[in-house]
A protein has these predicted regions:
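Membrane-helix boundary/interfacial segments in multi-pass membrane proteins
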Residues: 44-45, 140-155, 260-267, 302-316, ...
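Extracytoplasmic
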Residues: 265, 426-508, 844
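Hydrophobic, aromatic-rich transmembrane alpha-helices
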Residues: 214, 238, 297-305, 317-353, ...
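Membrane-interface coil-to-helix junctions
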Residues: 19-107, 133-156, 266-309, 359-375, ...
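Active-site-proximal, structured, solvent-exposed surfaces of multi-pass membrane proteins
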Residues: 2-4, 651-664, 700, 708-715, ...
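Membrane-embedded helix bundles of polyisoprenyl
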Residues: 23, 103-117, 124-172, 180-218, ...
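Extracytoplasmic/lumenal acceptor-recognition loop(s) of multi-pass membrane glycoenzymes
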Residues: 52, 358-362, 467-542, 553-555, ...
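Periplasmic/ER-lumenal interhelical loops and adjacent helix-loop junctions
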Residues: 49-65, 71, 242-328, 383, ...
Length: 869
């Protein structure tokens, strides 16, 4: 092996430290929090969050309570590491501290790992330094830290240490003493790296890399290392068992929830299409992923980097850097008989399969794998899962590429020192040009560096004085996406639950429990219809004790929800049983007269179970009902709900002989609204009117897009908001993404629904309920809007044959009960309790009435057990 020049002092390490310190200094903003997007912030209340992580299987604070669907327990390790720092440092520094520490850890992980391969003494050499700089400054790393998530940055920081320590362990199986030391080191590193697996799919990626490395060593060294490989696999599972077992319980009992959630249903195909746009070799060589194109409110998500790469010289620097990677790949192919090189090439194949999703033959394999709905859901955004192994192997290949060029120059009789000086200087110049925005403060998204107003800490202090089980409804509410924008700058999935112990009914938790999502559908119906009594019933049904209205929240891209927020604030004072309790600047806290406490009910009515609905008419008629397949009371039309998937509609809907047939019930057909409908003008290059030669001829509008989107809308100007309607759409999906469809009022007061049409072949008919949101005739005009979108270079093509709107008296239909029973009254007997996450001790002072039931507000999950003694 040809060694590059060495120095008497560790100037290379000093150089790395200086570069890292420079990056930290220019990217740290004093008096701000690193907050927003997706974030884990236990430092707000470290002791409370430690308890949550320790008892992670049940997430009581998430809405109605749910079985943890993320690797919540994994963050326990990180929280224990952070604990002493939270006691001595301002909490606003903690996230900066962790992510900057991971930058140091990952950079020096590459450095020390490669130093063993390329340097025979403890003196410095240049190859590890150059490769470490690549690991730090490549564009994959920049994207990974742009909106830093603790799981991602931890994986980035520990991955080099994990892989190099595994290589060391497998290389020393013939030396028992050395092997024992390496095993202890490997166990220690695997324990520290556990926070990486908060996003569990990263654990799957890590396991895949481990198995590929083990396979490479077994192929090249034979059976000698088999016992050691079995031992390390068992140890990895044992080390991670404390969070894998709770997650296994989630998979057993709640797997369908994240797959069926409306947010995941709407975003899975779209997320993969975004990844597909960057699934080409030209992007792979730059490690450029879908973050680069991600939209923001006013510009692209990574606008500073987009401007930087608009200069072809900067882009060329990146491709020149990739030449070293390609040379290293060729070198590893030449050395493929060595297990390390074989394992590198196997990991390269894995990340190529994931990231080259638009490049044959990897695209064909991708399409085959994604026929499985679960795998398609889990790996809908492969970039964030596979980019770290890609960065790692690219860094190692860079080192081998440098070594190969130096070796070649030496054999060609060039001066090694002069050639090395030119080569290293050129590389440093290229990587400096390529990554220059990092040194101008562009490591983190600028909107993620914000101050948190004092009013939030006042609110946190207030809730510390309240019952920890008191459920909170947070308002205003917008769409189902669970993405919140604050007027003072924070944008993301939310943060207040990191310092509020009470359960919060936020949209961020809907994906893990469909009961949370059902609450949202009822809530948005009540808010848009401005019905105080209906909202009061929702608060009662879901045992909500507090309503938190935060006027700092706004909806920059949804004017309809902005209007709803204004009206919500006005009518909260009219909600029966709800009174203003506390005001902290723009944050208003209301208390409902019914507490979040266990209670007894006697002889409750038993109804048939429902799935999704707009309004729970069963609860209006029979508060605190039970559900059973053998129920005597049935609401056959209650779950005639169309805001989600067409396949979930429980009743067949048809039009026959001038009648609307829903199930076996007929309703008169009124076609008058369709006489005055109109649609927006066609855009010539993407929207085409097609007429077939059939008899009779078939006419439809074809929408075609490549890496673009366009809208087409049907307007029904005479549709009054005081009525409910049934919408029929006849459409056909050809290829790419299916159509999204939404219905709004022309005056932008109401958004009736927003969903995605099916991808079934052939002509399909979709039905949608548009419920009445007004009891008075103040406005008319309904728009039905279709969006044909392609987020990649793949064609999206869909046809629309007809869009028709018919009046339908929906509310009397949905409230129909069979047989007809008189309404019942609510008869709750509230009880005192002592609670501790898994355990609720409830004292019943007097013998309960016959046929009494104990209701625990957490019983929206079926997994609780009650014992009476």
């Amino acid at each position: 092996m040809i060694s590059l020049p060495r120095f008497k002092h560790p100037w290379d390490q000093i150089l790395l430290v200086l570069i890292l310190l420079t990056i930290i200094i220019v990217n740290f903003s004093p008096a701000t929090w690193l907050i927003g997007w997706d974030n884990l912030m236990p430092e707000f209340n470290i002791w409370m969050n430690l308890k949550r992580s320790f008892f992670a299987v049940w997430q009581e604070y998430q809405g109605l309570g749910l079985v943890g669907g993320m690797g919540h327990a994994t963050d326990l390790i990180r929280q224990l590491i952070l604990l002493p720092f939270t006691l001595i440092l301002p909490n606003s520094l903690i996230r900066y501290l962790w992510h900057f520490a991971m930058l140091f850890l990952g950079t020096f992980g590459i450095y020390f790992g490669l130093k063993k391969l390329f340097c025979r003494t403890d003196q410095a050499c240049l190859i590890p330094t150059i490769a470490s700089l690549f690991y730090l400054l490549n564009f994959g790393t920049i994207q990974y830290f742009w909106v830093p998530l603790e799981s991602f940055s931890t994986f980035w920081g520990f991955f080099p240490w994990l892989i190099f320590s595994l290589w060391d362990y497998l290389n020393c199986v013939w030396n028992r003493h050395a092997c024992s030391l390496q095993l202890k080191k490997l166990i220690f590193l695997n324990i520290l790296a556990i926070p990486s697996f908060y996003v569990q799919t990263i654990f799957l990626v890590y396991l895949a890399c481990i198995f590929l490395i083990i396979f490479a060593f077994l192929i090249r060294t034979g059976q000698a290392c088999l016992p050691s490989t079995i031992k390390i696999v068992i140890l990895i599972f044992l080390i991670n068992s404390f969070w894998l077992l709770p997650f296994g319980y989630f998979l057993k009992t709640n797997l369908t929830n994240p797959v069926a959630g409306i947010g995941n249903f709407m975003s899975s195909d779209e997320s993969f299409d975004r990844n597909l746009r960057r699934g080409y070799i030209s992007d792979f060589l730059l490690l450029r992923g879908y973050y680069f194109d991600f939209p923001d409110t006013h510009a692209t998500f990574m606008a500073p980097w987009g401007i930087h790469f608009s200069n072809n010289f900067n882009l060329a620097a990146g491709y020149l850097l990739s030449l070293f990677v390609l040379i290293g790949i060729v070198y590893s192919i030449y050395k493929i008989k060595k297990p390390i090189h074989l394992s590198l090439l196997l990991i390269l194949s894995l990340v190529s399969l994931a990231l080259l999703s638009a490049t044959p033959p990897f695209s064909f394999i991708n399409q085959f794998i994604r026929q499985n709905p679960l795998l398609n859901q889990v790996f809908r955004a492969p970039f964030t899962k596979f980019i770290v192994p890609a960065i790692f192997v690219f860094s190692i290949f860079t080192a081998y590429g440098l070594q190969t060029l130096v070796t070649l120059a030496t054999r060609l009789k060039y001066s090694q020192k002069i050639f090395t000086l030119i080569l290293v200087s050129g590389y440093l110049f290229l990587i400096s040009i390529f990554s220059f925005p990092v040194f101008r403060g562009q490591l983190f998204y600028s909107l993620n560096k914000q101050s948190v107003p004092k009013q939030y800490f006042q609110m946190f202090d207030y809730f510390r004085q309240q019952s920890p089980t008191a459920r909170i409804a947070n308002l205003p509410q917008g769409s189902f996406w669970g993405w919140t924008s604050y007027r003072f700058g924070i944008v993301g999935s939310g943060f207040i639950w990191y310092d509020i112990e009470q359960p919060i009914l936020d949209r961020a938790f809907d994906a893990w429990n469909l009961k949370n999502e059902q609450y949202y559908w009822e809530l948005t119906t009540a808010l848009q219809s401005r019905d105080p009594l209906l909202l009061s019933r929702i608060l009662s049904k879901y045992s909500i004790e507090f309503v938190l209205f935060d006027d700092n929240i706004f909806f920059p891209s949804e004017k309809i929800y902005s209007k709803t927020a204004l009206s919500t604030k006005d009518f909260l004072s009219q909600v029966p049983g709800l009174s203003l309790e506390k005001q902290f600047d723009k944050i208003s806290i209301y208390r409902f007269h019914q507490p979040t406490k266990p209670y007894l009910i006697s002889s409750p009515p038993i109804l048939n179970a429902q799935t999704f609905f707009y309004t729970d008419f069963a609860f209006i008629d029979h508060p605190d009902y039970l559900t059973s397949p053998s129920a005597k009371i049935n609401y056959p039309f209650l779950n005639l709900f169309t805001n989600r998937l067409q396949s979930e509609i429980p009743l067949d809907i048809k039009i026959n002989n001038q009648q609307i047939q829903i199930g076996s019930t007929n309703f008169p057909l009124n076609d008058s609204l369709n006489q005055t409908k109109n649609h927006s003008p066609l855009i010539s290059n993407t929207q085409q009117l097609v007429q077939t030669n059939d008899d009779p001829p078939l006419q439809f509008i074809r929408l075609t897009n490549i890496d673009s989107s366009n809208l087409i809308a049907w307007n029904f100007p005479d549709a009054a908001f005081e009525n409910s309607y049934l919408l029929r759409v006849i459409y056909r999906h050809h290829q790419g993404l299916p159509l999204t469809i939404s219905a709004t009022s022309e005056n932008l007061n109401y958004k009736f629904f927003y969903t995605r049409l099916d991808q079934k072949p052939g002509w399909q008919t979709a039905w949608f309920i548009i419920p009445r949101f007004e009891n008075y005739n103040y406005g008319t005009g309904i728009n039905v809007i279709f969006n044909n979108t392609s987020l990649s270079y793949r064609t999206s093509q869909n046809d629309i044959q007809s869009v028709d709107l018919y009046p339908l008296d929906y509310y009397p239909l949905a409230s129909t009960q069979l047989p007809q029973y008189s309404k019942t009254l609510q008869n709750r007997q509230y009880l005192d309790e002592k609670s501790s996450i898994f355990f609720h001790k409830i004292k019943i002072s007097s013998p309960p009435l016959p046929n009494s039931y104990l209701v625990l507000p957490q019983t929206f999950s079926p997994d609780w057990l009650a014992f009476y003694f």
